[in-house]
Design a protein with these regions (language model features):
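Core catalytic alpha/beta fold that binds nucleotide/phospho-ligands
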Residues: 1-104
Length: 104
């Protein structure tokens, strides 16, 4: 399952944590939240592996898009400048993610 959903970087990140399941759960929730914010859900051209959850140098969670997902978003918003805001939290055993896509 994890090899179908997560990138190699995400797997490495999660596996190096004390409680990997918690980190996988938050990242999975973020991918689902992004797909819903995009307005499509996961489908043919929207792949989990093309939505990577990472952290910036300050530890803030970020979404990195690649492949068909990046192209789909740019086409949908007509190549306008956009921002993706991501919030992750958990209250064991629950994981929660909120994604907002804004563009000008």
């Amino acid at each position: 399952f994890k090899n179908k959903i997560f990138t190699k970087k995400e797997i490495l990140y999660c596996e190096n944590k004390k409680n990997p399941a918690s980190f996988y759960a938050k990242r999975f929730a973020a991918k689902e939240a992004f797909a819903k914010a995009l307005g499509t859900g996961i489908r043919k051209n929207i792949s989990f592996k093309n939505i990577e959850i990472s952290n910036n140098r300050y530890g803030k969670p970020i979404i990195i898009l690649s492949g068909s997902v990046d192209g789909f978003l740019k086409k949908k918003i007509r190549n306008k400048k956009y921002n993706i805001y991501l919030s992750l939290s958990d209250d064991k055993p629950w994981a929660h993610a909120t994604v907002i896509i804004s563009y000008i």
